[in-house]
Amino acid sequence: MMRLFARVMLAMCLAVVVGFHAQAQTKPKVTTSGPDFPKTALFVGNSFFYYNNGMPGHLSFMERAAYPENKAAYRNTMATIGGSGLDWHDMENLLRAGGLGAYSFDEQNNVVFNKPGRQYDAVVMMDCSQCPIHPQLKDAFATFARKDSEIVRAHGMRPVLFMSWAYADKPEMTEALAEAYTIAGNANDALVIPAGLAFARVRKLQPELNLYAPDKRHPSPAGTYLATCVTFAALTGRSPVGNSYTMGLDAPTVELLQKAAWDTVQEYYGL
C-alpha cells in the first residue's frame, strides 16, 4: 500500500513539473504584424527557403489566391545562401537603394520596374538550422538578430524571424529552437513565424506524411507547403484553410497542412 501511495505521489509530482515547464515556455510578445500586414517581403536565409522552387514564391501565389482583387500588390523575394546563418548576409547591402526589388516579374512573365524607394514592407530572417541552439553559434544568432532588426527598421521595414524546424531524426530540436527564436523575437520586438512548431504538430497528427527530403533536414514539397501556410497565417492574420493554392498536393494533404498551420499560429500567439 505504501509503495502504491508513493508511486501515485511521484506521478502527481511529475505531472505538476511537466505542466509547470509547459506553462513556463517563453510566450511571444508580438502576435500580429498589424492591421496593415506586409504585402511585400524579403526572405533572408538559406536552403530551407529556396528548396522546392522557393517558399517565398509559393507564398506570393497563396496571397494572390486569397486577395485576387489586388494581385499585383503581393511580391516576395529571396536572398539565400546554402547553409548560411544570418552572419553570412550583409543586411545593409541587401537593402540598399536601387538593389533588390528594383524590378520583378508579373504573372505573364513581364519585367515590371517597381516604384523607386522602399521595396519591402518586411524582412523575414532565418538563421542556419542549428545556429540558434549550437553552443558555438548561438551568440552570433542573438547578435545578428539584434543588428539586422535594427538595420531593417532603419530602412522603414518590419523585422520578422522565421522559426525553423527540427531534423526528422532529432525531434528534440523543436522545443530548443522555439525557445531561442521566441526569446530573440521578444528582445527585438519582432514577429516570429512558428514553422517549427507546425512541423512538430503535423508529425504527431500524421506521422506517415513525409515533411522532409531524404537528407532529413530540408523540406519535402509537403514541408514547403506547410511552411508557406504558416507564413501566410502569421503575416496576414488570416486562415489558410480553404485557400485555392495547393502547390499540386492532393486535397486531403492540403486540408491537413492548412488546418495544422492555422492551429499552430493561433496557439503560439495565444489567440
PLM features per residue range, with description:
Residues 35-38, 49-57, 135-143, 171-175, ...:
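Soluble non-cytosolic domains of exported or imported proteins
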Residues 20-24:
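Sec/Tat signal peptide C-region and signal peptidase I cleavage site
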Residues 9-19:
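Bacterial N-terminal signal peptides
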Residues 25-65:
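N-terminal module-boundary/linker segments of secreted carbohydrate-active enzymes
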Residues 50-136:
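Conserved SGNH/GDSL esterase-like catalytic core that processes O-acyl groups on lipids
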Residues 218, 228-271:
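Conserved catalytic region of serine esterases and O-acyltransferases that act on ester linkages
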Residues 107-224, 233, 240:
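Alpha-helical cap/lid subdomain in secreted, periplasmic
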Residues 1-10:
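Bacterial N-terminal signal peptides that target proteins for export
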